């Protein structure tokens, strides 16, 4: 494969030799060709050769040549518009910066900026923590449902009752006794339905 290296004013002075280490190891000397004020170094290697055209404009040497050309044109078209804008004095600029600083609201240091994306406040949720005066670690609370109390009076009444126990809890009325017969269980489940209308054809 032949490697073409262009030496330009960006890298070195024109006319200087540039040789790769592979060429020195192989012992093959590079051949130099002068094209339009640029020196071209080609090293012969085995395989296919890819030769670049001799006269390349500077824009095509970039990786994104067509994109660069389009942006250069847009910059040229936008250039006169930017020059028409009036120049502001230093006093006006300082006044604008002071106004901008005053208009910015104070940021919350409690939450990082990413948490401002959420529409809710995490502190607004209900907290089920008890005050430190009431200790419930010694109470057997396994199997006790969570009870939400609205007022402090009901909370005081709850603590006056003592520790809750599953044995003292009244059984719900829908719960049937295992010793009852199946017929009595079915009688408890009977529900009166409205009378059927025979006039309506289905």
From Swiss-Prot:
Primary location recorded for the protein, binned into one broad class: cytoplasm
UniProt entry tagged with the keyword Ribonucleoprotein: no
GO CC, one annotated term: nucleus
Keyword Phosphoprotein among UniProt keywords: no
Gene Ontology process terms (BP): chromosome organization; homologous chromosome segregation
A Pfam family hit: Securin
Family (UniProt): Belongs to the securin family.
Protein's recorded name: Putative pituitary tumor-transforming gene 3 protein
Species the sequence originates in: Pan troglodytes
Gene name as annotated: PTTG3
């Amino acid at each position: 494969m032949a490697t073409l290296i262009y030496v330009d004013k960006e890298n070195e002075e024109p006319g200087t030799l540039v040789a790769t280490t592979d060429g020195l190891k192989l012992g093959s000397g590079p051949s130099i060709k002068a094209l339009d004020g640029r020196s071209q170094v080609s090293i012969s290697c085995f395989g296919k050769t890819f030769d670049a055209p001799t006269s390349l404009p500077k824009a095509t040497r970039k990786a994104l040549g067509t994109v660069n050309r389009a942006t250069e044109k847009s910059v040229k078209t936008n250039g006169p518009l930017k020059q028409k804008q009036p120049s502001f004095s230093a006093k006006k600029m300082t006044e604008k910066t002071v106004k901008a600083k005053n208009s910015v609201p104070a940021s919350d240091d409690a939450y990082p900026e990413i948490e401002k994306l959420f529409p809710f406040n995490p502190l607004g949720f209900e907290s089920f923590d008890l005050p430190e005066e009431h200790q419930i670690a010694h109470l057997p609370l396994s199997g006790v449902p969570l009870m939400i109390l609205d007022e402090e009076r009901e909370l005081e009444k709850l603590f006056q009752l003592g520790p809750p126990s599953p044995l003292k809890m009244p059984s719900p009325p829908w719960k049937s006794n295992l010793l009852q017969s199946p017929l009595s269980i079915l009688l408890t489940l009977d529900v009166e339905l409205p009378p059927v209308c025979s006039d309506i054809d289905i």
